Amino acid sequence: MAEAAQIHALSDLMRELPSVRRARDYHLYDFRGKRYLDLYLSGGRALLGHRPDHLLLLVKNQMAKGLSGDFPSPLEGRLARALGQILPEHGIVRIYANMERLLAALAAWAGKHQPPVPLADPAIAPIGEGVLAALWRPFLPPQGVQPEILVPVLPFPAAFAPVVLCGRGDSARGLPPSDLVSPALLTGLVASVHALARLAERYGEEQWRMVDGPLWERRGPYLRARCEKEQYAGLFRRLLEVGIVINPQYPGPSIVPALFSGGEIKPLRALAGE
């Protein structure tokens, strides 16, 4: 119970951010006009920024056709083919309305008498032997161990976006069928996969290492806090005071944005005592 209470308290840290009036690129603006550099990026969903114009235009065009409902769509196949370009060994694709539906499907597939299947996060620690399911995050080096199930964190900046599960091996064919989801949202997911290649042209090690320091252990663009769990809320609040938002969940990951100035990250170095 104490552990659950601590997790709840950490998730509530985001409530300490003043009301957000707008979000643009990699910044949040509160109702007073103060700007915050966002290193949380909605857990990775906002890796393209909070307002990727091309992606949002495609979604808007689908909405204008009335395709906001949960309908069958050829976009399911397009999404599977796009994912096949980045995860060729995990060709069994399921699309679920939300993470709760995905985890329920995963639990049903793994067996009713098995404990809940946790999703390992390679941004926090390398995937070890025996891991059944893990998140897949862009811009991380290949993992030595490939679990049977991967859940891609796709950069579609919407909390209501569907989530995708990719499996490999004959047993993964027994995964529960996909949910019907809005073709408009599927359009956003397809576009987000293709956008990763374009982002790679301007987002890499030279940029990521600019935030290196004693506060973090970095894997690619992902930052794992080095402090103890009991110290994390204090770190979150101190950075919030100087205009930086990090992941409200310990130990992260926080994420290096694709656009920032040297001045914006000076508080990170000052806080680390550099």
Can you say where each PLM-predicted feature lies in the sequence?
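Short, acidic, Ser/Thr-enriched surface-loop or helix-capping motifs
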Residues: 30-31
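Active-site-adjacent loop/helix segments that line or gate small-molecule/cofactor pockets in enzymes
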Residues: 1-27, 47, 76, 82, ...
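Conserved C-terminal alpha-helix-loop-beta "cap" of PLP-dependent enzymes
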Residues: 34, 127-130, 134, 140-144, ...
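Glycine-rich phosphate-binding segment of PLP-dependent enzymes
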Residues: 36-37, 41-74, 81-93
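Conserved PLP phosphate-binding loop immediately N-terminal to the Schiff-base lysine helix
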Residues: 103, 118-153
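Active-site nucleophile and cofactor-binding loops and adjacent substrate-binding regions
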Residues: 70-77, 93-100, 153-155
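Short loop-beta-helix segment that forms the pyridoxal 5′-phosphate
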Residues: 84-121
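Active-site C-terminal subdomain of aminotransferase-like
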Residues: 136-230
